[in-house]
């Protein structure tokens, strides 16, 4: 896709798994540094950047429920995992000289500030990167839903989801080599066809608030800037 894109404010969703690199658990510091370098590159282009990070590299709340435990407690543990990842990415960005603030949906004043919409927008207007930790602050909601919610709250021009592949496919291309890749889709098509790019709540929230979604591979060095320049490979989701 070669459509030229012009975005002033973006929200980037990074999965926790992306931070693992080749590991089976935790954070690969070199991967975190590379992702931070991509973010610093687009920040230098004048783009305002907010980020939501998942926690799946450390813990998933559904894992507790699947073993007979309390889902709410499990999701609270997952929220803490997103805070760990947020602090790690802030560290990587700070090393590059990028001013970064972590705002959490769950109060932890000795570690980071609590989220408020006005505070987030204020920091972005100052040129700082803002990382949203703690998901939505409520159980039963994914970090994809949190990303869509925050994108709507801060008035982001687009929500970018960095994934393991270079767009949205009809099936997992790592499993099905015949899977069809899409250049463009609508929110309704994702919902109707049951495409597994985001959960239904996240896609519906994006549709209702006119938040376009771009899905691209987070593993390509410099890939974020390429997408924003319209030269990368990605899938655009809009109405």
From Swiss-Prot:
<feature type="binding site">
    <location>
        <position position="56"/>
    </location>
    <ligand>
        <name>ATP</name>
    </ligand>
</feature>
<keyword id="KW-0665">Pyrimidine biosynthesis</keyword>
<dbReference type="GO" id="GO:0044210">
    <property type="term" value="P:'de novo' CTP biosynthetic process"/>
</dbReference>
<feature type="binding site">
    <location>
        <position position="169"/>
    </location>
    <ligand>
        <name>ATP</name>
    </ligand>
</feature>
<comment type="subunit">
    <text>Homohexamer.</text>
</comment>
<comment type="pathway">
    <text>Pyrimidine metabolism; CTP biosynthesis via de novo pathway; UDP from UMP (UMPK route): step 1/1.</text>
</comment>
<feature type="binding site">
    <location>
        <begin position="13"/>
        <end position="16"/>
    </location>
    <ligand>
        <name>ATP</name>
    </ligand>
</feature>
<dbReference type="InterPro" id="IPR001048">
    <property type="entry name" value="Asp/Glu/Uridylate_kinase"/>
</dbReference>
<keyword id="KW-0963">Cytoplasm</keyword>
<feature type="binding site">
    <location>
        <position position="75"/>
    </location>
    <ligand>
        <name>UMP</name>
    </ligand>
</feature>
<dbReference type="GO" id="GO:0005524">
    <property type="term" value="F:ATP binding"/>
</dbReference>
<dbReference type="GO" id="GO:0033862">
    <property type="term" value="F:UMP kinase activity"/>
</dbReference>
<comment type="similarity">
    <text>Belongs to the UMP kinase family.</text>
</comment>
<dbReference type="GO" id="GO:0006225">
    <property type="term" value="P:UDP biosynthetic process"/>
</dbReference>
<keyword id="KW-0418">Kinase</keyword>
<dbReference type="Pfam" id="PF00696">
    <property type="entry name" value="AA_kinase"/>
</dbReference>
<feature type="binding site">
    <location>
        <position position="55"/>
    </location>
    <ligand>
        <name>UMP</name>
    </ligand>
</feature>
<feature type="binding site">
    <location>
        <position position="172"/>
    </location>
    <ligand>
        <name>ATP</name>
    </ligand>
</feature>
<feature type="binding site">
    <location>
        <position position="164"/>
    </location>
    <ligand>
        <name>ATP</name>
    </ligand>
</feature>
<feature type="binding site">
    <location>
        <position position="163"/>
    </location>
    <ligand>
        <name>ATP</name>
    </ligand>
</feature>
<protein>
    <recommendedName>
        <fullName>Uridylate kinase</fullName>
        <ecNumber>2.7.4.22</ecNumber>
    </recommendedName>
</protein>
<dbReference type="GO" id="GO:0005829">
    <property type="term" value="C:cytosol"/>
</dbReference>
<keyword id="KW-0547">Nucleotide-binding</keyword>
<dbReference type="InterPro" id="IPR015963">
    <property type="entry name" value="Uridylate_kinase_bac"/>
</dbReference>
<comment type="function">
    <text>Catalyzes the reversible phosphorylation of UMP to UDP.</text>
</comment>
<keyword id="KW-0067">ATP-binding</keyword>
<feature type="binding site">
    <location>
        <begin position="136"/>
        <end position="143"/>
    </location>
    <ligand>
        <name>UMP</name>
    </ligand>
</feature>
<dbReference type="InterPro" id="IPR011817">
    <property type="entry name" value="Uridylate_kinase"/>
</dbReference>
<keyword id="KW-0808">Transferase</keyword>
<feature type="binding site">
    <location>
        <position position="60"/>
    </location>
    <ligand>
        <name>ATP</name>
    </ligand>
</feature>
<dbReference type="InterPro" id="IPR036393">
    <property type="entry name" value="AceGlu_kinase-like_sf"/>
</dbReference>
